[in-house]
A protein has these predicted regions:
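Short, intrinsically disordered, charge-balanced linker/junction segments flanking boundaries
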Residues: 129, 133-136
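Glycine-rich phosphate/pyrophosphate-binding beta-alpha loops
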Residues: 35-39
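Specificity-determining recognition surfaces
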Residues: 1-24
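Glycine/small-residue-rich phosphate/adenosyl-binding loop
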Residues: 46-126
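A generic alpha-helix structural signal
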Residues: 24-28, 57-60
């Protein structure tokens, strides 16, 4: 395990060939097996290829344009350039795996201390799933 952790690296140059379904399944299984706070498993995995991937990238581009023109979250402005760079990378990959938290609260909802702690724990659980997936 230490070898996998110490030799892990981010790849940002991709081959123009599809990822075999069994590889995608193994990556998803690694995420599913991650530990989660109170075993809530606060994740849904969405695999996007082809037209679905193109549509997801287009939706992100549209959202970034809207955010630049009229910020929904004004504090996000410094991060737009980074998100645009991420979008360029997303367009190059053969498959995208989105991880969403179906238990998350609305951005506009005021949270109690317990709800805030739960949100933090869910985010950490999703982080564990992502790490498992990248080590796979």
């Amino acid at each position: 395990m230490i070898e996998a952790i110490t030799t892990r690296r981010s790849i940002r140059k991709y081959k123009d060939k599809p990822v075999p379904k069994d590889v995608i399944t193994e990556i998803l299984q690694a995420g599913i097996l991650a530990p989660s706070s109170k075993n809530r498993q606060p994740w849904k995995f969405i695999v996007a290829e082809g037209d679905a991937k193109a549509a997801a990238c287009q939706a992100m581009e549209n959202g970034l344009k809207r955010e630049k023109q009229m910020p929904f979250i004004p504090e996000s402005s410094p991060y737009i350039n980074g998100a645009e760079h991420t979008l360029q990378i997303m367009r190059q990959v053969p498959v995208l795996i989105f991880i969403v938290n179906p238990l998350a609260s609305s951005f506009s909802k005021a949270l109690s201390m317990d709800e805030r702690v739960s949100e933090i724990c869910n985010s950490q659980s999703i982080g564990a799933a992502i790490e498992n997936m990248t080590l796979e």
